[in-house]
């Protein structure tokens, strides 16, 4: 009987996104999953990775780079990896955890092949901040035997930085939600972070341009801009803070419209969730968004400075059921996560040993 392959995830295990990856990988019998976290661990890891196969570095990494505290943990991580002796190191978020994994190999002789998953701003934002960050990102990408991107647009930028083998698949859903009940045509929902990169003020402005006392906007999530946004929102807008998964699913299910208008983004899991719940997406004009939304067909692509008008909404509202069915079918066909991870691991195992 063949021994399972030791596979080490390196990332932020307080992120539900890394937990989703861990669940998908742990379900594959040929892998023995180990996880090193730059912070701690969500409780969901308890059911899939035993404590003996986990390392918590207990830092507070900065997604934008400059992670001195994280780099100080490099010797500890390297010692752990030498004990684990993984065949694969899989780093999530290239400018922080990817750098850490690359340095562990380069400076401490850690064995195993490196694979990297880009999450968005590590490719779309961080390399533009400085020449040093750009050079570092390029080195990490070139050290990876395989990388993943959740959009073609981001994959193109990765290739320009030196990545040579990229798998593109959405960071999708674990399961399809049930068919939505009757939608409320007056209800709009938004749940991206209330931080500058997500441009939540654009959501408020777009909604405020629509007439009608019956219209309602529900804004979920939290962030540094919340107080400022609450002061500028009109009386039709309600802020509900961070939501658990079931409560959030309820808002998706009831809302006809979903708003996501960031200034930079790759394929958003939140937009995929909204589409799976039958919402009509209203998104900013970004290359990754255009991979999901065809303006005027299955949603709205709102250009910078463009006002949202009843005339833009009406034709889509008239076809709401057909749009919901088409969007759900696309998500089920293209954006369920487990089959994509299965194909990803098959690709890894097919690579020539170095």
Regions found by a protein language model. Give the residues of each.
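Nucleotide-activated donor-binding/catalytic signature segment of Leloir-type glycosyltransferases, i.e.
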Residues: 227-246
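Conserved donor-binding/catalytic core segment of Leloir-type glycosyltransferases
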Residues: 148, 173, 180-208, 218
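N-terminal subdomain of nucleotide-sugar transferases
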Residues: 1-47, 208
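Donor nucleotide-sugar binding/catalytic pocket of nucleotide-sugar-dependent glycosyltransferases
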Residues: 116, 134-178
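Aromatic "clamp/platform" in nucleotide-sugar-dependent glycosyltransferases that forms part
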Residues: 263
